[in-house]
C-alpha cells in the first residue's frame, strides 16, 4: 500500500509550472484565504500516525507545504514584474508623445519658413520688375536728351552710317548668293556629265545585250536545226525500213515465180523515199527568209539555207545514195550530235565571257559610285547615288547567279559529252542484208520509238540540247526583265 500511495501522490508534486497567469494567482489567493479560514477552524481529532499509510500522507503534506511556499514566492515575484512592466510602458508612451510633439513642431516651423521664403521671393520679383521699368524709362530719357543736345548736322551722318551698314550687309548677301549659284552650276555640270556617261554606258550595255540576244537566238536556231535533223533522220530510218521490207517481200515473190532470173541488189535503182524533199521537212510556221531578231524568223532562214544549199537534202547527186546506202542510218545520228556539241560549247563560252565582262564593268561602276558617295557632301545627291548603288548591287547579284547557272550547265554538258563518248557506237558494215537484220533486231520500228526520235529524247545529247534551250530562254527572259528595270 505504501508503494502505491507514493506512486500516486509523489509524482504529481515534482514538476510544477515556472510561470503562472493572473487567473491562477487569483485562484491561489482564494485557496490561501480558504486555507487561512480552515486554520482557524479546529480540525477533527484524528491521529495520522495510526493510519495504515501514515508515512505517505506525511510526505505528501510536506511536499504540499513546500509547494505552497514556492507558489507564494512566485506570486510576489510576478506582481513585482507586472508593476515594473506597467511603469516601463508608461515611460515609453511618454517618450513617444514627446517625439510626436517635437516632429509636429518641426513640421510647423518648416512650413512657416517656406511661406516666409515664398513671400520674400515674390517681393524680390516685384522689386526687380519695378527696377527694370525704371531702367527702361531712364534709357529713353537719356536718348531724348542726347538727341536734343546733338547738333543738326550729326543726324545725316548717322543716317549715312546706317545706310552704309545696310549696303555692306546686302553686298555680303549678294556674294553668298553668287557663290551658291556657282556651286549649283558646277553641280549641274557634273550631273550632266554623269548623265552623259550613264547614257553611254546604257547604250553600250544595250548593244551588249542585243549581241547576247543574237547569240542566244543563234544557239536556239542551231538547237532547232539539230532537233529537226534528228526528227528527219528518224523519219528517214522508218521510211527506209519500210521500203527495205517491201523490197524483200517483192524479191521473195520474184524468186518464187522466176528462179532463173537473178538480179543483184546493188544494181537496183535507188529508193526515192530515202531523202525527203525540201517541202517535206517538218516546218510549219511559213517560208519567209527575211532576217530579224525573232527566233521564228531565224529558224526560217536556217531552214531555207538547208533546203537550198545542203548536199544531203538536195536530190541532184543520186550517186551518194547509190554508193553509201549503209552508212547513213548510223551517220545521220552522229552528225547532228557533233554539230550540237560544238555549237553549244562555243555559244555557252561566249555567253559566259559576255556575262563576266558585264560583271566586271558593274564592279568598276560600283567602285566609282563609292568614290562619288565619299566625295559628295549634298544629301540629295548622296541619296540618289546610294539608290543607284543598291540597284547596281542587285544587278550584280543577278549576273553572278546567271554565271553560276551557266557554269553548272557547262559542267552538265561536259558530263553528258563524256557519257556519250563512252557509249559504244554501232559498227558500220557494207552488206545491206546485215544492216537490215541489225536494224530490225536493235531498232524495231514502233510508234513509240518514232515519237521519241521525233521529239529528240532518244539520246542523252538531245536531252542536253533541251536543257540548254530552257536555260537560254531563261537567260533571254532575265535580260529582257533587266532592260525594263534599267529603263525605269
Swiss-Prot record:
Coiled coil located at which positions?
Answer: 71-226, 377-403
Any one Pfam family match given in the protein's UniProt record, by short name: Cep57_MT_bd
UniProt biased composition (Basic and acidic residues): 259-270, 314-325
User: Which domain of life does the UniProt lineage start with?
Assistant: Eukaryota
- Provide this UniProt record's keywords sorted from A to Z: Centromere, Chromosome, Coiled coil, Cytoplasm, Cytoskeleton, Kinetochore, Microtubule
Q: Where in the cell is it found?
A: Cytoplasm, Cytoskeleton, Microtubule organizing center, Centrosome; Chromosome, Centromere, Kinetochore; Cytoplasm, Cytoskeleton, Spindle
Q: Enumerate composition-biased segments (Polar residues).
A: 452-464
Where composition is biased (Basic residues), the residues are: 241-250
Record GO terms (molecular function): gamma-tubulin binding; identical protein binding; microtubule binding
Q: Gene3D superfamilies from the xrefs?
A: 1.20.58.90
GO:BP terms for this protein? attachment of spindle microtubules to kinetochore
Q: What GO cellular component entries does it have?
A: centrosome; cytoplasm; kinetochore; spindle microtubule
Q: Where is this region: Disordered?
A: 232-272, 311-342, 416-464
Protein's job: Required for spindle microtubule attachment to both kinetochores and centrosomes. Also functions to tether minus-ends of spindle microtubules to centrosomes. May act by forming ring-like structures around microtubules, or by serving as a cross-linker or scaffold at the attachment site.
| Self-association and partners | Interacts with clip1, mis12, ndc80 and zwint. Interacts with gamma-tubulin.
Q: Which family does it belong to?
A: Belongs to the translokin family.
Q: What is this protein called?
A: Centrosomal protein cep57l1
Organism whose genome encodes this protein? Xenopus laevis (African clawed frog)
